[in-house]
Structures are given as C-alpha cells and as structure tokens.
Swiss-Prot record:
GO terms for biological process: lipid catabolic process. The keyword Hydrolase applies. This is Lipase 3. Its EC number is 3.1.1.-. Residues 1-20 form the signal peptide. Keywords: Glycoprotein, Hydrolase, Lipid degradation, Lipid metabolism, Signal. PROSITE patterns: LIPASE_SER. The active site is at S164 (charge relay system), H369 (charge relay system). It comes from the Eukaryota. The keyword Disulfide bond does not apply. It is an enzyme of class 3 (hydrolase). Glycans are attached at N131. The lineage of its organism: Eukaryota, Metazoa, Ecdysozoa, Arthropoda, Hexapoda.
Length: 394
C-alpha cells in the first residue's frame, strides 16, 4: 500500500469512528444545554416571509432567573451562525459572559444559514429563495428579530453586538431604517465591515476583480446557495481538523487565509468544533456584495448592472448607505492584523459616524478578524471591554 493510500484509509476509518461514535455538538441549542445553561428557540417571520430561528439564553444558572433583565442581541458574520457566540464554552464565550453578567441573551441567525433555511412560500431549491445579499438581512432580518425580542421581553431597547457581517447589517439597518436607532442602547461592532477598499484577504483580492463586477452571469449565479452545511462535510471536517490530525495545520491555515495569520490566538482543540458548525451557509450574493465593496471602496447598495440599477434605484450606480442616520452610540473594536477589515477602512467608517462612542484598537499586535469569536484571549482583549462598555449604558 502506498503512503497516500494509507493516509486515505486512516482518514476514512477515522471518519467512520466519528460517524459511529461521539462528535462535537453541531447544534447551537444542544451545545448551550450541554454547557448547563437554559436555552430557548424562537421563530420569527420577516416582512418578506423568511422564517428565522433565534437562540436565547434567558439567564445564567450562576445568577438564577429574574425579571426585567436587560437584553443583549448578538449577530454573527457571513457563513456563521449563533453557534459562534457559544463555541468556546462557559467563561470564554461572549454569550455566556453576558448571561453571567445579568443579560437576557438573544442570538440571531440570518436568512439562508443553518438555522434559517425556510420561507413561507419558497423551498430552498428555488433560486428565488437565494436572491438576497446582506442588504436584505439588514433591511428585514435584523429589524424583525429586534422587534420580536422587544415584544417578548417588554424591553424598550437592546444592546447590539455584531461581528463582521453582523456589523454590516447593523449599519444597513440604522442607515436605511433610522427609526431603529431608538431601539438600540449601544452598538458594539467587532471587526466592523463597511468600507473594504483596503482589505488584505488574498481570496477576496484574487476574485473580487471578476466576481465584484456586475454582469449577467454574476447576476444569475448570485442567487444560489454558498457553502452550505451538511452532516457529511461536518464529519469530514471534524475528523480532518482534530488537534492530533496530520491535517490540523491545513485547517488552521484555512482560517488564517480568511482573516489574518495569528497562531497565538488559535486553540487547535477548538478546530473540530469550528468545523462542526462552520461554514453555516449563505447566498452567493452576500459574498459578491462584499467583493463589490472592495472594488468600489464605497459602502453602498448592491450593484445589479447599469441596466437594472435605474429600475432598482433610479440611478445608474447604487446609492451609498446613509451613515449620517446612524444616531445610536457606536463602539468600534478592530485589530491591527485583520485582513478583512483594515485599520484604515475602519477609521474611515469612524470618521463618518455621527455618534462615535469608542474607538478601540485591540491591544494585541497580531489580532485578526476571526480572533473576535475564536481567539483564546478574546475575553481578555475584547469581551471584558465590551461588557464594561455595555454596563455603562445601563
């Protein structure tokens, strides 16, 4: 048997053990319960009929149930889900930290991801289901979830925390639906993704010049599912990305290639848990919209082509988002080694926000984009500061 064949055999045997035996928990709700916290699932229907699932940690077992708890609403990035906020476990994950601090924690899921692949009328195999970008997530999903949370809890406002695309959709919401500013106590944007003209991610830089140019082919391909999750891919990723696997470094480099190289903040024991939950799926158009942002250097709506734009917007070019409408307090947290959200782009955003409350460059030189959710010292360098700032608004 050749060495290559032997490696394949070992991999398939290991995969069989994963399929037959124990594996990291892939479901967010089950993971929360396994960690000893109370969990609720809630369904929300948007005004354009997408059915979304939220996960809730109503209180911490350390503090017990109480009434009138302030609300923290957490929103994930692209290809991610609510699982990101609990993946590192108690004491280390932001959702658990906030619950321990007395918050009623709600975690959203955008249309098209693992937990929100449903529509009142359209099955997911219809192309029209996937005809959205992060613009629609900001215009419809986040407002619908916030309205539901406020109605359910009786609170008047939420503390918003977003990572990556979770920051983008917040800015879309408050720019284009400014009435939602009144429902936000403060917005904590981790790795804020708005202006992206100086992005260093080699993947985006390689493909954006082609995929970020509107044309008929891109328009057709945009309304498709992008990197969906399924059990086979999860099991294969879990086996290949175990800390003891010969492929562990390859898995780590995949993460570094997206958000920036930082071995000091990556726990190799977490890799198989990441693969159990990510990627969580999205629409191709979400990725194309970010490619357009890189090409244009602007923070603006989706570019459908010069033929369709006049019908959609009344102009040949898509309009910029109205950041002047973002009146709720915004706190920016960003890293010097973030390949997705360059320091210069974040500071351009900072200078355009009318109510900037915090400019926080993470005091760790190699801090990268995905360290905000998976970094071993995320609590020390980011979450403690987020919690302190949130409490100042209570």
């Amino acid at each position: 048997m050749t060495r290559g064949a032997l490696k394949v055999t070992i991999l398939l045997v290991g995969l069989g053990l994963v399929l037959a035996g124990s594996r990291p928990i892939s479901d967010c709700g089950e993971r929360i319960e396994d960690d000893g916290y109370p969990m609720e699932r809630h369904e929300v229907v948007t005004s354009d009929n997408y059915i979304l699932t939220m996960h809730r940690i109503p209180y911490s077992p350390k503090t017990g149930e109480s009434s009138n708890r302030p609300v923290a609403f957490l929103m994930h990035g692209m290809l991610s889900s609510s699982s990101d906020w609990v993946l590192m476990g108690p004491e280390r994950s932001l959702a658990y930290m906030l619950a321990d601090a007395g918050y009623d924690v709600w975690m959203g899921n955008a249309r098209g991801n693992t937990y929100s692949k449903a529509h009142k009328y359209w099955p997911t195999y219809w192309q029209i289901f996937w005809n959205f970008s992060w613009n629609e997530i900001g215009m419809y999903d986040v407002p619908a979830m916030i309205d539901y949370v406020l109605a359910k809890t009786g609170q008047q406002q939420v503390q918003y925390v977003g990572h990556s695309q979770g920051t983008t959709v917040y800015l879309v919401m408050v720019s284009e639906r400014p009435e939602y500013n009144d429902k936000i106590k403060s917005a904590h944007l981790l790795g804020p993704a708005a202006y992206m003209g100086n992005m260093k991610s080699p993947l985006t830089r390689a493909f954006a010049p082609i995929l970020g140019q509107p044309n008929a082919i891109v328009e057709v391909c945009g309304s498709m599912e992008f990197m969906p999750s399924n059990k086979f891919k999860q099991d294969l990723g879990i086996e290949m990305c175990q800390a003891t696997s010969p492929y562990a470094d390859m898995c780590a480099n995949e993460i570094f290639l997206i958000g920036g190289y930082d071995t000091e903040q990556l726990d190799y024991e977490l890799l198989e848990h990441i693969k159990a939950t990510s990627p969580a799926g999205a629409s191709v158009n979400q990725n194309l919209h970010f490619c357009q942002e890189y090409n244009s250097g602007k923070f603006r709506k989706f570019d459908y082509t010069a033929l369709r734009n006049p019908y959609e917007y009344g102009s040949y070019f898509p309009p910029d988002y109205k950041l002047k409408n973002a009146k709720a307090p915004v706190l920016l947290y960003y890293g010097a080694n973030d390949w997705m959200c360059d320091v210069s782009d974040v500071r351009k955003l900072r200078d355009e926000l009318p109510n900037m409350a915090l400019d926080y460059l993470v005091p760790f030189e190699k801090w990268a984009h995905l360290d905000f959710i998976w970094g071993t010292e995320a609590r020390k360098y980011v979450y403690d500061e987020v919690l302190k700032q949130m409490q100042s608004y209570e």
